[in-house]
Amino acid sequence: MKAITRILALAMASCLMLAACEKEDGASKNTVTVNGVTYENVVASVDDSRNGLWFNFVLTEDGKTTASALIDDGIALEKTLKYGVDEGNGGYGDWMCLSVEYPDEKIYSVEPKSGTQTIKKQDGGYSVVIDGKDDNGKDFKMNLVAKIVKL
């Protein structure tokens, strides 16, 4: 239950599989490059490209977290996030969502088995809502709101 106490500020457009980080030779630092920017001390990163929405998520050891998404027309969504991860279910190798909301509780790691995804423009950004069911058939809702940033 430790993971449920972790706080997430925002939600992601879809549940994502965490990608492996590349390790630098002779150093303990993990690095990952997103849109030409290299991040060091990376704890976890995500790369997803479903439903025409590309999303990349990077968490660094100092707690700085950057998420960016690319819509098909070349407009980027970018937001700095606060991040928590479900450590009680296999840690960084698991599927995860940001801020999955159940009617009666919050849980931070779930792989949707079914559901619908709606993406719409909203106040200079995009709003993404996923209604779905988790592995146990329990309903959940996931939300992402992000501003538009030119690449």
Question: What residue spans do the PLM features occupy?
Answer:
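N-terminal cationic leader/targeting segments used for protein routing and processing
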Residues: 3, 30-31, 121-122
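Bacterial Sec-dependent N-terminal signal peptides
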Residues: 15-41
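C-terminal or internal capping secondary-structure element at the end of a domain, subdomain, or sheet
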Residues: 119-151
